[in-house]
Amino acid sequence: LDGGTNWKWMTVKGFEKTDFRDIEAFDKTTAVIMGIAEPAYILRTIDGGDTWQLVFENKTKGMFLDAMEFWNEQAGIVIGDPINGHFFIARTFDGGQSWQGIPENLSPVADSGEACFASSGTNIRKLTKKEAVFITGGLVSHVQVRNKKIRLPLIDGKETTGANSIAVKNKKTWMVVGGDFNTKDSSTKNAVISFDGGKTFVLPDVPPTGYRSCVEFLKKKQWITCGLNGVDITNDDGKTFSNISKEGFHVLRKAKKGKTVYFAGGGGRIGKMVW
């Protein structure tokens, strides 16, 4: 509540063993959190985390939620790994108080061995006021808008490879990062950028310095990305990246107001950068 100076650690009573991988905070008292798997949960608080209400539960075998995204304080979406060959998608239109699953026959079809990574909560992003874009990895890696599927020129072919995160500058300019999380220092096909709404993707001349699990657009031509072995920044729309830290993080997010970027990593580590 004070811009990251002080932190209060908490465990949600009754959900001590749940692996929560994504959070959306609307203000200092209201937030929703996503627990990933079997059963998958979404909880909501209106008192700053003192108490939580269960607003979504799915016990389907194989259910695995990957990320949430919100267009505003009312409309949101959650995406999960494929069930019966279709990606799981649910929507909320009341700020996360209730969620409705999209019928399976209307959900995007997944290729064999294709899934999403719950590494940073950023494999789905709002694209326009009504559309979202999401990315996949595994044996094959795609970017998808509704049922339009575009193959990504990222490393793939294994369960540990592919796209992990997408950031959107505008409806035409997107950046996708990933790699192979089992080879954290490899820069092979670990980032791409599109300037034409996904029709084509360009590899950097100088890529990030390893596997990257999260990317965020900052301003103008500046983007920032992080992974297990450090943090990189580009000031030329992804043509060249420079390593600015060897400290590894799973996720980074730009504050909704101001010029602060927050990082989170293993072992309860939190970082902060003012840009």
Task: Give the ranges of each region predicted by the language model.
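Residue-level hotspots at or immediately adjacent to binding/recognition sites across diverse folds
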Residues: L1-W275
